[in-house]
Amino acid sequence: MAAKPFFRRRKVCPFSGDNAPKIDYKDTRLLQRYISERGKIVPSRITAVSAKKQRELARAIKRARFLALLPYAVK
C-alpha cells in the first residue's frame, strides 16, 4: 500500500479578514513581530503575509525606522 503524500497546510494572511489589525507605522508592537532579532524584515514565506500586505508592512517598518520608532539594526 502506497503512503499518503504529506501536504503542508497553507497559512492564512494575518492581515486579511474582518477583524484583522491595520498596518500602521505608529503601531510598533505589531511591527516588532515582523522584524527578526537582528532588526531585519522577516520574509512573507515565513510569516504567511500576502504580497500586498508584505509591501505595506515593509513600507510601515521603513517609515517607523526613519522616524526612530524602530531600530535599523540590533547589535
UniProtKB/Swiss-Prot annotation:
The keyword rRNA-binding is annotated on this UniProt entry: yes
Swiss-Prot/TrEMBL keywords: Ribonucleoprotein, Ribosomal protein, RNA-binding, rRNA-binding
Record bears the keyword RNA-binding: yes
PROSITE patterns attached to this UniProt entry: RIBOSOMAL_S18
GO biological process terms, semicolon-separated: translation
GO (cellular component) term, any one: cytosolic small ribosomal subunit
GO-annotated molecular function: small ribosomal subunit rRNA binding; structural constituent of ribosome
Alphabetical list of InterPro entries matching this protein: Ribosomal_bS18, Ribosomal_bS18_CS, Ribosomal_bS18_sf
Pfam family, one: Ribosomal_S18
Coiled-coil boundaries: none
Family: Belongs to the bacterial ribosomal protein bS18 family.
Subunit record text: Part of the 30S ribosomal subunit. Forms a tight heterodimer with protein bS6.
Function per UniProt: Binds as a heterodimer with protein bS6 to the central domain of the 16S rRNA, where it helps stabilize the platform of the 30S subunit.
HAMAP family in the cross-refs: Ribosomal_bS18 (MF_00270)
NCBIfam families per the UniProt record, alphabetical: S18 (TIGR00165)
Protein name, entry field: Small ribosomal subunit protein bS18
Native species: Dinoroseobacter shibae (strain DSM 16493 / NCIMB 14021 / DFL 12)
